[in-house]
């Protein structure tokens, strides 16, 4: 779901990280928070040189292997529980994933190829070092949460093997059993220790095991179809609407529809494409058109895999109900075992593991800014402890679809600012990278655009939320009738949030730059002193 850097693509950056760890900062020991973060990324502030660029095969392989995670078992199952129709799934996910691919190809990749800088330095130039520090810290927390969700998925595989019942996250179970917690702690500890030992070997292992995972999803779904009564291809659409995606939400689930599917597929990785997180990897691309390689990940991982896991979920529930089980528990391990046997169990275990490891690695790097005297392995281990705690909370999986949506909406504005700075500001006669040019510690237009856009969109969603944010219903008392009656689906907030963010940022930037007088001289290639 959330991709990690591919092995071999970031050799220069990782070599630099090792040098930073063993030798310290290049210009003496950094003391301030900003200097520590700058030192961590010091060797990545220069644009990528031509000899480091990669071709189509690298990016096709990367997206194909890194967007099938253990959480695909969860998200496909949640769509079944939220009562979408077959049309919603097939058409909605197709449109949402197409929008995601176009966002990578037309927004993220062109800027990455033009600037050849990491997202850290892009945000540093636009928003100033203080907001960049905040971005890194909050991103680390979110990455720990996502890694914890992936550990939970792997834990269901181990628990199934040893006969321990997993919490029913689709029913909203909050408290797991003590044996399940013990297994989650054990699985999380193994993942944390392996992440501490090194990233390159783990990334290589992920690239070796990942290619067969799509076949497990596909074969499991095909094998499950007879259980649902599908005897020929002509039966599928009727069965899909009657027994899989029925259009009726299960108790305790919100009703989703076509636009929910579109929004979820688009928002799932919005921090990477519209949020510009993947400029860090596409800066190594020879051409911006390589952004279309994202289609291999989206339509394998977030289309085919979600549909297949939904089919396996429905087949498992029907089998359990036929056996007299009143409350089927469609955990990733349960549905995979029914559809693909023990190959499915292995797939669940590895799909969670191979994605949790690099996610935890990235969280450790982001946390490192606040721990100047700690070695990287200690920071990664601390992040691992947080990951393990989160893995023991089943509610994370129950709300995973909304978590990834809100996470994407929160980080997306910073990417929007980069897009506007690079392409729009020159047309408006404004200075791009103004915070860098003026050596500002914080860009107040970026702060207003970031927190203003997310705050407004979150409030519009939460004020009428049916199950989560009752305490925010009071907002309606202070709104005009039209706004008070407006009900915003969190999955439909991507475009409004982007427009609102760039509008606030652009208007505030015009005020800032016009009040400051003449345009500043162009910033040097070196990042400004803080």
Short names for language-model regions:
Residues 418-504, 518-524:
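C-terminal membrane-solvent junction of multi-pass transporters and transport-like membrane proteins
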Residues 63, 136, 164-197, 211-222, ...:
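Transmembrane alpha-helical segments of multi-pass small-molecule transport proteins
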Residues 187-238, 292-298, 403-416:
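Membrane-interface loop-to-helix entry segments
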Residues 27, 94-127, 135-151, 316, ...:
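Juxtamembrane transmembrane-helix boundary signature
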Residues 80-83, 109-110, 126, 134, ...:
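Membrane-water interface regions at transmembrane-helix termini and the short interhelical loops
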Residues 54-73, 224-228, 241-314, 335-357, ...:
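Hydrophobic, membrane-embedded alpha-helices of multi-pass small-molecule transporters
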Residues 12-88, 224, 248-263, 280-290, ...:
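Membrane-interface "cap" regions at the ends of multi-pass membrane proteins
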Residues 156-160, 214-246, 263, 270, ...:
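Hydrophobic alpha-helical segments and their helix-loop junctions in multi-pass secondary transporters
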């Amino acid at each position: 779901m959330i991709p990690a850097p591919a092995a071999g693509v970031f050799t220069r950056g990782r070599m630099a990280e090792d040098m930073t760890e063993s030798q310290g900062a290049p210009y003496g020991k950094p003391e301030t928070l900003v200097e520590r973060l700058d030192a961590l990324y010091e060797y990545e502030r220069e644009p990528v040189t031509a000899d480091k660029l990669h071709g189509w095969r690298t990016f096709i392989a990367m997206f194909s292997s890194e967007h099938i995670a253990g959480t695909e078992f969860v998200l496909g199952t949640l769509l079944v529980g939220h009562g979408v129709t077959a049309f919603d799934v097939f058409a909605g996910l197709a449109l949402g994933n197409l929008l995601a691919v176009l966002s990578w190809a037309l927004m993220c990749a062109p800027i990455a190829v033009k600037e050849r800088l990491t997202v850290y330095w892009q945000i540093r130039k636009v928003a100033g070092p203080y907001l960049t520090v905040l971005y890194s810290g909050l991103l680390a927390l979110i990455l720990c949460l996502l890694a914890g969700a992936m550990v939970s998925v792997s834990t269901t595989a181990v628990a199934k093997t040893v006969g321990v019942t997993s919490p029913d996250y689709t029913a909203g179970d909050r408290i797991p059993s003590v044996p399940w917690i013990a297994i989650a702690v054990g699985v999380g500890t193994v993942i944390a220790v392996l992440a501490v030992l090194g990233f390159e070997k783990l990334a290589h292992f992920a690239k070796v095991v990942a290619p067969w995972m799509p076949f497990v999803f596909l074969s499991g779904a095909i094998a499950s179809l007879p259980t649902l009564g599908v005897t020929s291809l002509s039966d599928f659409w009727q069965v899909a609407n009657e027994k899989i995606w029925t259009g009726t939400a299960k108790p305790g689930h919100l009703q989703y529809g076509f636009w929910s599917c579109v929004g979820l597929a688009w928002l799932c990785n919005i921090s990477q494409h519209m949020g510009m997180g993947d400029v860090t990897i596409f800066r190594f691309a020879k051409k911006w058109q390589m952004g279309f390689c994202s289609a291999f990940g989206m339509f394998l991982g977030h289309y085919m895999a979600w549909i297949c896991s939904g089919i396996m979920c429905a087949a498992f529930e029907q089998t359990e109900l036929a056996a007299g089980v009143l409350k089927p528990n469609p955990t990733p391990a349960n549905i995979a075992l029914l559809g693909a046997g023990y190959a499915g169990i292995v797939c669940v275990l590895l799909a969670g593991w191979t994605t949790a490891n690099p996610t935890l690695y990235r969280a450790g790097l982001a946390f490192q800014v606040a721990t100047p005297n700690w070695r990287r392995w200690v920071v990664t281990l601390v992040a691992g402890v947080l990951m393990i705690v989160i893995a023991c909370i089943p509610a994370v999986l129950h709300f995973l679809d909304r978590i990834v949506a809100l996470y994407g909406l929160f980080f997306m504005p910073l990417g929007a600012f980069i897009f506007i700075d690079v392409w729009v500001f020159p047309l408006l006669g404004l200075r791009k990278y103004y915070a860098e040019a003026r050596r500002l510690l914080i860009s107040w237009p970026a702060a207003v655009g970031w927190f203003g856009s997310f705050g407004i969109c979150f409030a519009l969603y939460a004020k009428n939320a049916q199950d989560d944010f009752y305490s925010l219903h009071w907002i309606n008392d202070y709104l005009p009738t039209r706004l008070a009656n407006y009900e915003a689906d969190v999955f439909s907030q991507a475009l409004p949030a982007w427009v609102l963010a760039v509008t606030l940022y652009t208007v505030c930037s015009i005020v800032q730059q016009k009040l400051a007088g003449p345009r500043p001289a162009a910033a040097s290639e070196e990042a400004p002193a803080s």
